[in-house]
């Protein structure tokens, strides 16, 4: 719904762990005006300059807690992501990305929060990849960013 606002301008950058550049990060906004419980956030489809970064490379930081995997986020049933808040999406990429301009392709994987559907238990047991979810966001969005 608010796809033009999915990332915070100027937030795309490399990050370090233990003195080494470990990957890149970007501040993300929820594309749902009501916000949602974190357990419904199932990760992101992330591609930069034609390279896809799978769910296993991603961590999510929100609500003043350390970055967590989306397996951990799936258990945060009582923790909410409010529309006004940005979260930080970390993507492991040893050495980070080169300085300069990049093309970021992004899609949020959000489960629907409007009551129980027949497919919901299957999605909980075998969550589809973010790009394969039939949730709120159906398209990949493209952003020109710079480190």
What are these regions (language model features)?
Residues 1-147:
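Terminal leader/tail segments of proteins
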């Amino acid at each position: 719904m608010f796809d033009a606002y999915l990332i915070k301008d100027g937030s795309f950058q490399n990050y370090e762990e233990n003195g080494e550049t470990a990957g890149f990060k970007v501040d993300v906004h929820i594309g749902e005006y009501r916000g949602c419980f974190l357990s419904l956030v199932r990760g992101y489809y992330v591609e930069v300059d034609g390279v896809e970064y799978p769910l296993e490379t991603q961590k999510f930081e929100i609500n003043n807690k350390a970055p967590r995997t989306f397996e951990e986020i799936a258990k945060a049933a009582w923790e909410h992501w409010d529309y006004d808040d940005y979260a930080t999406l970390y993507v492991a990429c040893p050495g980070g990305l080169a300085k300069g301009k990049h093309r970021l392709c992004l899609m949020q994987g959000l489960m629907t929060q409007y009551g129980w559907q027949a497919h919901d238990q299957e999605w909980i047991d075998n969550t589809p990849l973010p790009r394969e979810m039939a949730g709120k966001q159906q398209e990949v969005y493209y952003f020109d960013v710079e480190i």
